[in-house]
Regions:
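A structural signal for multi-pass alpha-helical bundles of membrane permease subunits
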Residues: 2-4, 8-283
Length: 283
């Protein structure tokens, strides 16, 4: 039984509050900075209260303000990032579900070896695979295409492992009952395993969506056309431009806030399923 000591309760809440402040304060500063003019930062002070230039700053980044700097409009950048994140997350989940299903429920030679080889890929850093992967993508003519941005990243050993562990917890009686009812392998997968995996799918979707959204190195390598670049690439260009010329920190922070909105919305909309999926995965 856990003792309910007031001092322990106070310390627990204090640590949680400090952690929340450390995490949320930079985000708060970015939001506040996006509402001020560039002159507000020239004095070296950091404003902590909202300014009156929010509409002007966001109209600049969503209008023609970035195009005047030789950068593309923000809407296509957000769309490119969204397409890449959705393609990676959905692709990873589909491939991992099918892989885990085959490893757990199908009998074929070297089944355990196949899973071991999949799991070993976790030990390969991304940098080791960059050059051979880029060579294959270039030879297939997939540079500056959504396929070239997404397909090399849709295999996930982590998701395959998590789905495999979950499928191993499914009672064998369900499989036997499905066979008695005349259900084939696909029907068992579609009507029984998929509904049971809903929470796990939601949890992994959020993780994989954020993974796809924050990709920087790979899209930077396989895209030379601004029409296919993601928002993080342009954000880096804005940072370099601000350091080399007149700093426009308000515009930079406005773009940063815009880049944070989609993943935050995904987490907010699916947080209950996300937490439930993590709990079920731990079981």
């Amino acid at each position: 039984m856990v003792e309910n000591r007031p001092i322990l309760k106070f310390l627990t809440h204090l640590i949680l509050i400090i952690g929340i402040i450390l995490i949320c304060f930079p985000v708060y500063v970015a939001i506040i900075a996006s509402t001020h003019s560039s002159a507000a930062f020239s004095s070296g002070t950091l404003p902590l209260l909202p300014g009156k230039y929010a509409l002007e700053n966001y109209n600049t980044i969503f209008g023609d303000g970035l195009m005047q700097r030789g950068l593309p409009n923000l809407w296509p950048l957000l769309m490119n990032s969204l397409i890449m994140a959705l393609g990676i997350s959905i692709g990873k989940i589909i491939i991992s579900l099918l892989s885990a299903y085959a490893i757990v429920y199908m009998r074929f030679p070297f089944r355990k070896t196949a899973f071991a080889l999949i799991f070993i890929t976790l030990m390969l850093p991304v940098e080791v695979r960059i050059i051979p992967t880029y060579t294959v993508v270039a030879q297939l003519g997939m540079i500056n295409t959504y396929g070239g941005m997404i397909i090399p990243l849709i295999a996930s050993a982590t998701a395959t492992f998590l789905f495999r562990q979950f499928f191993l917890t499914v009672p064998d009686e369900l499989l036997e009952a499905a066979r008695v009812d005349g259900a084939g392998p696909f029907k068992f997968f579609k009507d029984i395993l998929l509904p049971l995996s809903k929470s796990n799918i939601a949890a992994l979707f959020i993780i994989m969506f954020i993974y796809g959204w924050i990709q920087y190195l790979w899209p930077l390598i396989v895209t030379t056309d601004q029409n296919h670049q993601t928002i993080l690439i342009i954000l880096k260009q804005l940072i370099v431009e601000s350091l080399q010329h007149d700093p426009q920190w308000n515009i930079l922070m406005a773009v940063s806030v815009a880049a944070m909105v989609p993943p935050v919305l995904v987490v907010i909309c699916m947080q209950r399923l996300f937490i439930k999926g993590l709990i079920e995965t731990e079981k």
